[in-house]
Curated annotation (Swiss-Prot):
This is 3-phosphoshikimate 1-carboxyvinyltransferase. It catalyses: 3-phosphoshikimate + phosphoenolpyruvate = 5-O-(1-carboxyvinyl)-3-phosphoshikimate + phosphate. InterPro entries: Enolpyruvate_Tfrase_dom, Enolpyruvate_Tfrase_sf, EPSP_synthase, EPSP_synthase_CS, RNA3'P_cycl/enolpyr_Trfase_a/b. Phosphoenolpyruvate binds at K22, G96, R124, Q171, R344, R386, K411. Keywords: Amino-acid biosynthesis, Aromatic amino acid biosynthesis, Cytoplasm, Transferase. Its main location: cytoplasm. It is found in: Cytoplasm. One of its GO terms (biological process) is amino acid biosynthetic process. It comes from Escherichia coli O6:H1 (strain CFT073 / ATCC 700928 / UPEC). The gene is aroA. Disulfide bonds: none annotated. The active site is at D313 (proton acceptor).
Length: 427
């Protein structure tokens, strides 16, 4: 297996221009494909997950052109639901941001298509979304294991009253919200359980509004969506930088700055993961906010005990930053780490122990006590981009670290290690 050894980093300093947000890129691509008119997306993320969405749109007959660097995409909207005339099966890798929204969107009309993906995708639950779509009339068959992909979709979603469990993934609600305006009837979506990752729903609602559709949000408990609507192209749309990707550079600055500035997101960003900067500030770093940037300067870091439900992806970065904080850090209410690209609670606990930390892994929490000195280790990444990026921070000590399968960062940030090297000074 390929590996990358990072030598100790004495200091980080500089500016990082963030690649486009994965969450925003894939939502914007699908809405542009469903919309009337031509949409130009700029600062689109070029990554595996986005390529899976683009390949799916091609198979579904959507016409688009990409710039040479794949960050500018001109899409001719379909002016309504997508039709799987020639496509029989779509392979979506491990891209939840493609699988969940497409599973809903392709239940409109009378399609007959199979959605499948990598082995890990077949372990990521989708039952709550399928249950909700079936309540709205969709005909969906599990082809292997009940409640998991692959799925056969045969259209039939017309709207109506739909209950969806919000406790596992906000992507199920996102998928329903994006699809419901195109259904022939009105849809009332009721949330069962506590809604996780609420800020990701705000991204969805924000983008739908950009594409001309507004819905009634009743305190995140119920959403009322008028049927028979259509999305309208906003013309040109700039995809903001990826706030989850920003977390590694901001944390690096908190641990070994200097000052690092990330551009492409700022105080008005629609992504909830910008709140990661508040957590670093609480730990002792100095944060400065601009309209189009966030900067972080090193501080003496202290442990925290916090509910991380609002920033599940960026919270992983706090788990490795905790290695450099004084005291025991506890991250709570993060059960949904278990159903991401890997079982992130298990993976994080296992790899933190390798570098010498004392770790308690609970059903929905992790507690981390750093060692006096970090140990050299080979870090397994579980084909999970965030594991690779999180554990790169170990090199901000006097200890090198080896990352196995470093290219797994291609899911969201293909040149992550080059960008980290650019702001790093060797120890």
């Amino acid at each position: 297996m390929e590996s990358l050894t990072l030598q100790p980093i004495a200091r980080v300093d500089g500016t990082i221009n963030l690649p486009g947000s994965k969450s925003v890129s894939n939502r914007a691509l699908l809405l542009a494909a469903l919309a009337h008119g031509k949409t130009v997306l700029t600062n689109l993320l070029d990554s595996d997950d986005v390529r899976h969405m683009l390949n799916a749109l091609t198979a579904l007959g959507v016409s688009y052109t990409l710039s040479a660097d794949r960050t500018r995409c001109e899409i001719i909207g379909n002016g309504g639901p997508l039709h799987a005339e020639s496509a029989r099966e779509l392979f979506l890798g491990n891209a939840g941001t493609a699988m969940r929204p497409l599973a809903a969107a392709l239940c409109l009309g009378s399609n007959d298509i199979v959605l499948t993906g990598e082995p890990r995708m077949k372990e990521r639950p989708i039952g709550h979304l399928v249950d909700a779509l079936r309540q709205g009339g969709a005909k969906i068959t599990y082809l292997e294991q009940e409640n998991y992909p692959p799925l056969r979709l045969q259209g039939g979603f017309t709207g109506g009253n739909v209950d969806v469990d919000g406790s596992v993934s906000s992507q199920f609600l996102t998928a329903l919200l994006m699809t419901a305006p195109l259904a022939p009837e009105d849809t009332v979506i009721r949330i069962k359980g506590d809604l996780v990752s609420k800020p990701y729903i705000d991204i969805t609602l924000n983008l739908m509004k950009t594409f001309g559709v507004e819905i009634e949000n009743q305190h995140y408990q119920q959403f009322v969506v008028k049927g028979g609507q259509s999305y309208q192209s906003p013309g040109t749309y700039l995809v903001e930088g990826d706030a989850s990707s920003a977390s590694y550079f901001l944390a690096a600055a908190a641990i070994r700055g200097g000052t690092v500035k990330v551009t492409g997101i700022g105080r008005n960003s629609m992504q909830g993961d910008i709140r990661f900067a508040d957590v670093l500030e609480k730990m002792g770093a100095t944060i400065c906010w601009g309209d189009d940037y966030i900067s972080c300067t090193r501080g003496e870091l202290n442990a925290i005990d916090m509910d991380m439900n609002h920033i599940p992806d960026a919270a992983m970065t706090i788990a490795t930053a905790a290695l450099f904080a004084k005291g025991t850090t506890t991250l709570r209410n993060i059960y949904n780490w278990r159903v991401k690209e890997s079982d992130r609670l298990f993976a994080m606990a296992t790899e933190l122990r390798k570098v010498g930390a004392e770790v308690e892994e609970g059903h929905d929490f992790i507690r981390i006590t750093p060692p006096e000195k970090l140990k050299f280790a080979e870090i397994a990444t579980y084909n999970d981009h965030r594991m690779a990026m999180c554990f790169s921070l170990v090199a901000l000590s006097d200890t090198p670290v080896t990352i196995l399968d470093p290219k797994c960062t291609a899911k969201t940030f293909p040149d992550y290690f080059e960008q980290l090297a650019r702001i790093s000074q060797p120890g």
